[in-house]
Amino acid sequence: MQIIVKNISYIYNRKTALALKALDDSSCIINQGEHVAIIGSTGSGKTTFIEHLNALLIPETGTINWIFENEHKKTKEKYLEDVVLKRTYFKKVKKAKDIRRRIGVVFQFAEYQIFEETIEKDIMFGPRSYGVSKEEAKQRAAKYLEMVGLPLEFLEKNPFGLSGGQKRRVALAGILAIEPDFLVLDEPTAGLDPQGVKDILDIFDNINKNGKTVIMVTHDLDNVLERTKRTLVFDKGKLIRDAGTYEILKDEKFLVENKLKSPKLITFVNKLEQRGIFLKPVTSIDKLAIELNIYLRNKQQSNE
Protein backbone atom coordinates (compact mmCIF):
# COMPACT_ATOMS: atom_id res chain seq x y z
CA MET A 1 0.00 0.00 0.00
CA GLN A 2 1.07 3.58 -0.59
CA ILE A 3 -0.29 6.98 0.44
CA ILE A 4 0.52 10.00 -1.74
CA VAL A 5 -0.25 13.35 -0.09
CA LYS A 6 -0.18 16.35 -2.44
CA ASN A 7 -0.31 19.96 -1.23
CA ILE A 8 -3.02 19.48 1.39
CA SER A 9 -4.27 22.33 3.57
CA TYR A 10 -6.86 22.34 6.34
CA ILE A 11 -8.60 25.14 8.25
CA TYR A 12 -10.44 24.71 11.55
CA ASN A 13 -13.48 26.95 12.16
CA ARG A 14 -13.49 27.97 8.54
CA LYS A 15 -15.19 31.29 7.70
CA THR A 16 -15.28 32.40 11.34
CA ALA A 17 -13.23 34.80 13.45
CA LEU A 18 -11.61 31.74 15.05
CA ALA A 19 -10.35 30.29 11.75
CA LEU A 20 -7.02 28.49 12.16
CA LYS A 21 -4.91 27.06 9.34
CA ALA A 22 -3.73 23.78 10.86
CA LEU A 23 -2.16 22.40 7.67
CA ASP A 24 -0.56 24.47 4.93
CA ASP A 25 0.39 23.00 1.54
CA SER A 26 1.94 19.77 2.88
CA SER A 27 3.10 16.92 0.63
CA CYS A 28 4.77 13.53 1.13
CA ILE A 29 4.68 9.89 0.05
CA ILE A 30 4.51 7.07 2.61
CA ASN A 31 5.24 3.54 1.42
CA GLN A 32 4.42 0.07 2.69
CA GLY A 33 6.84 -1.20 5.33
CA GLU A 34 8.24 2.15 6.49
CA HIS A 35 8.76 3.11 10.14
CA VAL A 36 8.11 6.85 10.26
CA ALA A 37 8.11 9.42 13.06
CA ILE A 38 6.15 12.67 12.93
CA ILE A 39 7.52 15.37 15.21
CA GLY A 40 6.99 19.07 15.88
CA SER A 41 6.12 21.44 18.68
CA THR A 42 2.61 21.53 20.16
CA GLY A 43 0.13 22.90 17.62
CA SER A 44 2.39 22.27 14.64
CA GLY A 45 -0.20 20.22 12.72
CA LYS A 46 0.91 16.66 13.48
CA THR A 47 -2.41 15.26 14.69
CA THR A 48 -4.37 17.11 12.01
CA PHE A 49 -2.10 15.54 9.40
CA ILE A 50 -2.59 11.95 10.59
CA GLU A 51 -6.36 12.44 10.74
CA HIS A 52 -6.23 12.97 6.98
CA LEU A 53 -4.40 9.69 6.37
CA ASN A 54 -7.53 7.61 6.93
CA ALA A 55 -10.03 10.23 5.76
CA LEU A 56 -11.23 11.31 9.20
CA LEU A 57 -10.65 14.85 7.92
CA ILE A 58 -10.92 16.16 4.36
CA PRO A 59 -8.52 18.98 3.42
CA GLU A 60 -9.63 22.31 2.03
CA THR A 61 -7.26 21.91 -0.92
CA GLY A 62 -4.96 19.22 -2.26
CA THR A 63 -5.34 15.51 -2.89
CA ILE A 64 -4.62 12.23 -1.18
CA ASN A 65 -4.14 9.06 -3.23
CA TRP A 66 -4.56 5.73 -1.47
CA ILE A 67 -3.10 2.91 -3.56
CA PHE A 68 -3.92 -0.64 -2.52
CA GLU A 69 -4.84 -4.03 -3.91
CA ASN A 70 -8.55 -4.61 -4.27
CA GLU A 71 -9.06 -8.16 -3.04
CA HIS A 72 -12.62 -8.16 -4.39
CA LYS A 73 -11.29 -8.22 -7.96
CA LYS A 74 -10.24 -11.53 -9.49
CA THR A 75 -7.17 -10.03 -11.15
CA LYS A 76 -4.07 -8.62 -9.50
CA GLU A 77 -5.12 -5.16 -10.68
CA LYS A 78 -4.52 -2.47 -8.09
CA TYR A 79 -7.30 -0.16 -7.01
CA LEU A 80 -6.39 3.55 -6.92
CA GLU A 81 -8.51 5.72 -4.65
CA ASP A 82 -7.86 9.26 -5.88
CA VAL A 83 -9.84 11.85 -3.94
CA VAL A 84 -9.96 15.41 -5.26
CA LEU A 85 -10.67 17.01 -1.93
CA LYS A 86 -13.17 19.80 -2.46
CA ARG A 87 -15.67 20.35 0.32
CA THR A 88 -18.18 21.82 -2.07
CA TYR A 89 -19.06 18.42 -3.44
CA PHE A 90 -17.39 15.82 -1.22
CA LYS A 91 -19.85 15.11 1.56
CA LYS A 92 -17.92 11.96 2.44
CA VAL A 93 -14.93 10.17 1.04
CA LYS A 94 -15.80 7.42 -1.39
CA LYS A 95 -14.45 4.07 -0.24
CA ALA A 96 -13.84 5.51 3.26
CA LYS A 97 -14.57 2.13 4.87
CA ASP A 98 -11.93 0.44 2.70
CA ILE A 99 -9.43 3.16 3.56
CA ARG A 100 -10.07 2.97 7.31
CA ARG A 101 -9.74 -0.81 7.34
CA ARG A 102 -6.28 -0.46 5.83
CA ILE A 103 -5.15 2.46 7.98
CA GLY A 104 -5.66 1.94 11.70
CA VAL A 105 -5.34 4.96 13.98
CA VAL A 106 -4.66 4.72 17.73
CA PHE A 107 -5.22 8.13 19.31
CA GLN A 108 -3.34 9.59 22.27
CA PHE A 109 -6.01 8.62 24.79
CA ALA A 110 -6.62 5.21 23.25
CA GLU A 111 -8.47 4.03 26.35
CA TYR A 112 -11.39 6.21 25.24
CA GLN A 113 -11.74 3.95 22.19
CA ILE A 114 -12.87 1.12 24.51
CA PHE A 115 -16.61 0.67 25.06
CA GLU A 116 -17.65 -3.02 25.14
CA GLU A 117 -18.47 -5.01 28.30
CA THR A 118 -15.64 -7.52 27.84
CA ILE A 119 -12.17 -7.22 26.36
CA GLU A 120 -12.92 -9.99 23.87
CA LYS A 121 -16.01 -8.20 22.55
CA ASP A 122 -14.11 -4.94 22.33
CA ILE A 123 -11.31 -6.44 20.24
CA MET A 124 -13.83 -8.33 18.09
CA PHE A 125 -15.84 -5.20 17.30
CA GLY A 126 -13.53 -3.88 14.56
CA PRO A 127 -13.17 -7.13 12.59
CA ARG A 128 -16.90 -7.84 12.87
CA SER A 129 -17.66 -4.34 11.53
CA TYR A 130 -15.65 -5.18 8.43
CA GLY A 131 -17.41 -8.47 7.74
CA VAL A 132 -15.12 -10.94 9.52
CA SER A 133 -16.94 -14.02 10.85
CA LYS A 134 -17.55 -14.35 14.58
CA GLU A 135 -15.23 -17.37 14.79
CA GLU A 136 -12.41 -15.58 12.97
CA ALA A 137 -12.92 -12.45 15.09
CA LYS A 138 -12.61 -14.55 18.27
CA GLN A 139 -9.34 -16.02 16.99
CA ARG A 140 -8.02 -12.56 16.22
CA ALA A 141 -9.02 -11.30 19.68
CA ALA A 142 -6.90 -14.01 21.31
CA LYS A 143 -4.01 -13.55 18.87
CA TYR A 144 -3.72 -9.78 19.25
CA LEU A 145 -4.34 -9.72 22.99
CA GLU A 146 -1.27 -11.91 23.39
CA MET A 147 0.64 -9.79 20.87
CA VAL A 148 0.18 -6.69 23.04
CA GLY A 149 1.43 -8.58 26.08
CA LEU A 150 -1.78 -9.40 27.96
CA PRO A 151 -2.78 -12.95 29.04
CA LEU A 152 -5.71 -14.78 27.46
CA GLU A 153 -7.63 -14.84 30.74
CA PHE A 154 -8.16 -11.11 30.23
CA LEU A 155 -10.57 -11.84 27.36
CA GLU A 156 -13.53 -12.17 29.72
CA LYS A 157 -12.56 -9.21 31.90
CA ASN A 158 -14.35 -5.88 31.87
CA PRO A 159 -11.91 -3.43 30.22
CA PHE A 160 -12.95 -0.56 32.47
CA GLY A 161 -11.32 -2.24 35.47
CA LEU A 162 -7.88 -2.19 33.85
CA SER A 163 -5.03 0.23 34.45
CA GLY A 164 -4.41 3.03 31.96
CA GLY A 165 -1.53 1.16 30.36
CA GLN A 166 -3.57 -2.04 30.05
CA LYS A 167 -6.48 -0.15 28.48
CA ARG A 168 -4.10 1.28 25.92
CA ARG A 169 -2.92 -2.23 25.05
CA VAL A 170 -6.50 -3.42 24.64
CA ALA A 171 -7.29 -0.47 22.35
CA LEU A 172 -4.18 -1.28 20.32
CA ALA A 173 -5.23 -4.95 20.08
CA GLY A 174 -8.61 -3.81 18.77
CA ILE A 175 -6.96 -1.84 15.96
CA LEU A 176 -4.50 -4.64 15.16
CA ALA A 177 -7.38 -7.11 14.92
CA ILE A 178 -8.64 -5.21 11.87
CA GLU A 179 -5.24 -6.14 10.36
CA PRO A 180 -4.50 -2.76 8.74
CA ASP A 181 -1.60 -2.19 6.36
CA PHE A 182 -0.72 1.09 8.08
CA LEU A 183 -0.71 1.64 11.85
CA VAL A 184 -0.84 5.32 12.87
CA LEU A 185 -0.13 6.14 16.53
CA ASP A 186 -0.62 9.48 18.28
CA GLU A 187 1.66 9.79 21.34
CA PRO A 188 1.49 6.02 22.04
CA THR A 189 3.86 6.12 25.03
CA ALA A 190 2.38 9.12 26.87
CA GLY A 191 1.84 8.33 30.55
CA LEU A 192 3.52 4.91 30.48
CA ASP A 193 6.32 3.89 32.84
CA PRO A 194 9.75 3.11 31.30
CA GLN A 195 9.08 -0.63 31.04
CA GLY A 196 5.67 0.03 29.51
CA VAL A 197 7.28 2.35 26.95
CA LYS A 198 9.83 -0.30 25.98
CA ASP A 199 7.18 -3.01 25.74
CA ILE A 200 4.85 -0.99 23.53
CA LEU A 201 7.67 0.18 21.23
CA ASP A 202 8.91 -3.40 20.90
CA ILE A 203 5.40 -4.36 19.74
CA PHE A 204 5.53 -1.65 17.05
CA ASP A 205 8.98 -2.81 15.95
CA ASN A 206 7.74 -6.38 15.52
CA ILE A 207 4.69 -5.19 13.59
CA ASN A 208 6.97 -3.19 11.28
CA LYS A 209 9.31 -6.17 10.79
CA ASN A 210 6.28 -8.13 9.57
CA GLY A 211 5.83 -5.65 6.71
CA LYS A 212 3.34 -3.21 8.20
CA THR A 213 3.86 0.54 7.99
CA VAL A 214 4.17 2.21 11.40
CA ILE A 215 3.69 5.98 11.71
CA MET A 216 4.27 7.42 15.17
CA VAL A 217 3.52 10.95 16.38
CA THR A 218 5.61 11.67 19.47
CA HIS A 219 7.52 14.28 21.45
CA ASP A 220 10.03 11.70 22.71
CA LEU A 221 12.93 12.14 20.30
CA ASP A 222 15.07 9.54 22.10
CA ASN A 223 12.54 6.90 21.04
CA VAL A 224 12.35 8.40 17.55
CA LEU A 225 16.13 8.08 17.20
CA GLU A 226 16.26 4.47 18.34
CA ARG A 227 13.15 3.13 16.63
CA THR A 228 12.46 4.94 13.34
CA LYS A 229 14.25 5.36 10.00
CA ARG A 230 12.46 8.41 8.59
CA THR A 231 11.12 11.56 10.22
CA LEU A 232 8.64 14.22 9.13
CA VAL A 233 8.92 17.58 10.91
CA PHE A 234 5.94 19.95 11.13
CA ASP A 235 5.91 23.61 12.14
CA LYS A 236 2.95 26.00 11.95
CA GLY A 237 1.04 23.58 9.75
CA LYS A 238 3.83 23.09 7.23
CA LEU A 239 5.85 19.94 6.60
CA ILE A 240 9.24 21.64 6.79
CA ARG A 241 11.56 18.64 6.62
CA ASP A 242 11.33 15.02 5.48
CA ALA A 243 14.54 13.01 5.77
CA GLY A 244 16.33 10.18 7.55
CA THR A 245 15.80 10.22 11.30
CA TYR A 246 19.49 10.35 12.21
CA GLU A 247 20.16 13.18 9.76
CA ILE A 248 17.41 15.33 11.27
CA LEU A 249 18.09 14.59 14.94
CA LYS A 250 21.84 15.13 14.54
CA ASP A 251 21.10 18.71 13.45
CA GLU A 252 20.86 20.36 16.87
CA LYS A 253 20.65 23.86 15.39
CA PHE A 254 17.59 22.86 13.36
CA LEU A 255 15.94 21.27 16.41
CA VAL A 256 16.50 24.35 18.57
CA GLU A 257 15.10 26.63 15.86
CA ASN A 258 11.94 24.51 15.84
CA LYS A 259 11.57 24.29 19.63
CA LEU A 260 12.55 20.63 19.77
CA LYS A 261 14.85 19.10 22.36
CA SER A 262 17.75 17.07 21.02
CA PRO A 263 17.89 13.39 22.08
CA LYS A 264 20.23 12.87 25.03
CA LEU A 265 22.31 10.42 23.01
CA ILE A 266 22.85 12.93 20.19
CA THR A 267 23.79 15.66 22.67
CA PHE A 268 26.45 13.34 24.10
CA VAL A 269 27.76 12.35 20.65
CA ASN A 270 27.99 16.01 19.60
CA LYS A 271 30.02 16.77 22.74
CA LEU A 272 32.37 13.92 21.88
CA GLU A 273 32.85 15.40 18.41
CA GLN A 274 33.69 18.78 19.94
CA ARG A 275 36.54 16.97 21.69
CA GLY A 276 37.75 15.34 18.49
CA ILE A 277 36.11 11.94 19.03
CA PHE A 278 34.15 10.89 15.94
CA LEU A 279 32.06 7.72 15.88
CA LYS A 280 29.87 5.99 13.32
CA PRO A 281 26.17 6.97 13.59
CA VAL A 282 24.66 5.51 16.76
CA THR A 283 20.98 5.31 17.62
CA SER A 284 20.99 3.55 21.00
CA ILE A 285 23.06 3.27 24.17
CA ASP A 286 24.10 -0.27 23.22
CA LYS A 287 25.40 0.89 19.83
CA LEU A 288 27.18 3.82 21.48
CA ALA A 289 28.96 1.44 23.86
CA ILE A 290 30.09 -0.74 20.94
CA GLU A 291 31.43 2.24 18.96
CA LEU A 292 33.23 3.68 22.00
CA ASN A 293 34.91 0.34 22.65
CA ILE A 294 36.03 0.19 19.01
CA TYR A 295 37.35 3.77 19.21
CA LEU A 296 39.28 3.12 22.43
CA ARG A 297 40.70 -0.15 21.12
CA ASN A 298 41.87 1.50 17.90
CA LYS A 299 43.38 4.38 19.83
CA GLN A 300 45.23 1.99 22.13
CA GLN A 301 46.60 0.03 19.16
CA SER A 302 47.79 3.20 17.43
CA ASN A 303 49.71 4.22 20.57
CA GLU A 304 51.53 0.89 20.87
Curated annotation (Swiss-Prot):
Q: Where is the ABC transporter domain?
A: 3-261
User: Coiled coil where?
Assistant: none
InterPro entries, per database record: AAA+_ATPase, ABC_transporter-like_ATP-bd, ABC_transporter-like_CS, ABC_transpr_CbiO/EcfA_su, ECF_ABC_transporter_ATP-bd, EcfA2, P-loop_NTPase
**Localization terms from the record:** Cell membrane
- Say which family it is in: Belongs to the ABC transporter superfamily. Energy-coupling factor EcfA family.
Name assigned to this protein: Energy-coupling factor transporter ATP-binding protein EcfA2
Q: Which PROSITE patterns match?
A: ABC_TRANSPORTER_1, ABC_TRANSPORTER_2, CBIO
The yes or no answer to whether the keyword Cytoplasm is present is: no
Pfam families reported for this sequence: ABC_tran
Q: Give the EC number(s) listed in the UniProt record.
A: 7.-.-.-
Q: How does it assemble?
A: Forms a stable energy-coupling factor (ECF) transporter complex composed of 2 membrane-embedded substrate-binding proteins (S component), 2 ATP-binding proteins (A component) and 2 transmembrane proteins (T component).
A molecular function (GO) held by this record is: ATP hydrolysis activity
Signal sequence extent:
none
